Amino acid sequence: MTRASLDKQPHEVASMFDDVAERYDLTNDLLSLGQDRVWRREVAKAVDARPAQKILDLAAGTATSSLPFARAGAYVVPCDFSLGMLRVGKKNHPWLPLTAGDATKLPFKDDTFDAVTISFGLRNVQDTDTALSELYRVTKPGGRVVICEFSHPTWAPFRTVYTEYLMRALPPVARAVSSNPDAYVYLAESIRAWPTQPELAERLRKAGWSKVAWRNLTGGVVALHRGFKAV
């Protein structure tokens, strides 16, 4: 089984997600105690997809995250670079236009999408700044980006408990339910190494996004960042 290192070599990350694809959604539901469904609902609200809009759902995995946008009447493109994830997504949701693509070199023309979103995927990209610039490039003027990512709890006592869960409790639980438990050791390590909420906001601004803001979910376990492409 593959476990990616924190230098996030693309072939390692893709292989790791290929390994967990079959049980990915179930494992996430169990490890997050069902909170992942709450977080994804908040993403859908922030994207605010409308009929006939074009939405890019990057790092869509099995495309479960794309369903709310499709139900809203938008044309959603689930995009991922794990072929294993895409195969599962195509089997489960054959009507969606699943697309293989790298976040640092997106296979779309400039100014294509009304909104772009990435949930729990930006942390796995080797070059975060290039990915943010690529998302900006493919977004129409006036469009928005919504990023949902694991982050850093703001209340110190809770942050301590959460860190203990990541490093001590999560790995054995993952061993019981995941087809590749080492992937969840990487998950814990990559969360600890991820930028803080203000740091990620600043990187969004440097990529060109305006009106950047964020709000914390579940006490900062997850942060929802949003920005706009100026008209």
Swiss-Prot record:
Pfam assignment, any one: Ubie_methyltran
Residues that, per the record, bind S-adenosyl-L-methionine: 62, 80, 102-103, 119
Pathway(s) of this molecule: Quinol/quinone metabolism; menaquinone biosynthesis; menaquinol from 1,4-dihydroxy-2-naphthoate: step 2/2
GO terms under biological process: menaquinone biosynthetic process; methylation
PROSITE patterns tied to this protein: SAM_MT_UBIE, UBIE_1, UBIE_2
Highest taxon of source: Bacteria
Reactions listed under catalytic activity: a 2-demethylmenaquinol + S-adenosyl-L-methionine = a menaquinol + S-adenosyl-L-homocysteine + H(+)
Keywords attached to this entry: Menaquinone biosynthesis, Methyltransferase, S-adenosyl-L-methionine, Transferase
Gene3D superfamilies, sorted: Vaccinia Virus protein VP39
Reported function: Methyltransferase required for the conversion of demethylmenaquinol (DMKH2) to menaquinol (MKH2).
Record-stated family: Belongs to the class I-like SAM-binding methyltransferase superfamily. MenG/UbiE family.
Name the record gives this protein: Demethylmenaquinone methyltransferase
Organism: Streptomyces avermitilis (strain ATCC 31267 / DSM 46492 / JCM 5070 / NBRC 14893 / NCIMB 12804 / NRRL 8165 / MA-4680)
